[in-house]
Swiss-Prot record:
Enzyme Commission numbers on file: 2.1.3.3
Disulfide bonds: none
Stated name of the protein: Ornithine carbamoyltransferase
A GO CC annotation given for this chain: cytoplasm
GO terms of biological process kind: arginine biosynthetic process via ornithine; citrulline biosynthetic process; L-arginine biosynthetic process
Annotated binding of carbamoyl phosphate, by residue: S56, T57, R58, T59, Q83, R107, H134, P135, C136, Q137, C266, L267, R294
Species, as recorded: Paracoccus denitrificans (strain Pd 1222)
Matching InterPro entries: Asp/Orn_carbamoyltranf_P-bd (IPR006132), Asp/Orn_carbamoylTrfase (IPR006130), Asp/Orn_carbamoylTrfase_sf (IPR036901), Asp_carbamoyltransf_Asp/Orn-bd (IPR006131), Orn/put_carbamltrans (IPR002292), OTCase_ArgI (IPR024904)
Length: 308
């Protein structure tokens, strides 16, 4: 039994195996209707709990569809239904769910909630997102890059904007997949130091460059994410926009990267804030391939967790 809690504490050979498995499964489904079951039905007779303390579109749809394509069934539970840690303890919830399901995916706020769920569950647990990390998204990002440009090892990846949870996982992935990483953004929104230290310890460059034009020089991939959350008050939104406006990914910024540099955004996006529509809809944008690949990457992760 394997839980998928983060990229940095998963063996790199297993991570590579998941990417390769995801690509094989995607290729095997080419041209088929979305509801067509996979030929081998690896999750036949399996039940998967999908816990959403934090709501989501892509995570819910991609995990739900992935389980169905592999022949399994899902039980979707919202934060209001679960009341994680408010009443019944997380530890007891994990123990109870383990009696009902074969696999748990949890999308939650606090990293501690994920870790406690994994500690007490007797079935594998998948990190669907926490405030600190978003490893499923970055596995899809690596898969997407390699579909379009070949091996990501040795490439230069630049993150522009807020050093958030996706950024943290992308730094972890730099260490595991062997690419160099540059962050450009305001000092108040730097990514966590521990992530940068981890990547450097694996022998790759993980640097901060305040000048966005210098940061993207020679980049093979430029990535950004939304500047604000749906829960942010208006005052915080305005402050963040003022901080981050110099780091908008636009055509002028992309001109400093390699001519064939890809652009990614995990979506949802606030168009013409963190990235312009010209970039998002441009020839080097792979944002919708990236969104689709959440499905395939997560199917591979589920198979790995269950040893299938």
């Amino acid at each position: 039994m394997n839980s998928f809690l983060d990229i940095h504490n998963t063996d790199r050979s297993d991570l590579r195996g998941m990417i390769d498995s995801a690509r094989r499964m995607k290729d095997a489904r080419s041209g088929q209707p979305k509801g067509t079951p996979d030929a081998d039905l690896p999750l036949k007779n399996r039940m998967v709990a999908l816990i959403f303390e934090k709501p989501s579109t892509r995570t819910r749809v991609s995990f739900d569809l992935g389980v169905r394509q592999m022949g399994g069934q899902t039980m979707v539970l919202s934060g209001k239904e679960m009341q994680l840690g408010h009443g019944e303890t997380i530890a007891d919830t994990a123990r109870v769910l383990s009696r009902y399901v074969d696999l748990i995916m949890i999308r939650t706020f606090e990293e501690a909630t994920l870790l406690e769920m994994a500690e007490y569950a007797s079935v594998p647990v998948i990190n669907g997102l926490t405030n600190r990390t978003h490893p499923c998204q970055v596995m899809a990002d690596v898969m997407t890059f390699e579909e379009h440009r070949g091996p990501i090892a040795g490439k230069k990846v630049v993150w522009s904007g807020d050093g958030n949870n996706v950024c943290c996982s992308m730094i972890h992935a730099a260490g595991q997949f062997g690419y160099d990483f540059t962050f450009t953004g305001p000092p108040t929104l730097d990514p966590e130091r521990e992530a940068l230290d981890f990547a450097r310890a694996q022998g790759v460059q993980a640097v901060i460059e305040r000048d966005p034009a210098k940061a993207v020089e020679g980049a093979d991939l430029v990535v950004t994410d939304t500047w604000v959350s749906m829960h942010d008050p208006q005052s915080a939104r305005e402050r963040r926009h003022n901080q981050l406006r110099p780091y908008q990914v636009n055509e002028a910024l992309m001109a400093h990267a390699k001519p064939d540099a890809l652009f990614m955004h995990c979506l949802p996006a606030h168009r013409d804030d963190e990235a312009t529509s010209a970039v998002m809809d441009g020839p080097n944008s792979v944002i919708f391939d990236e969104a689709e690949n959440r499905l395939h990457a997560q199917k591979a992760i589920m198979r790995w967790c269950l040893g299938l």
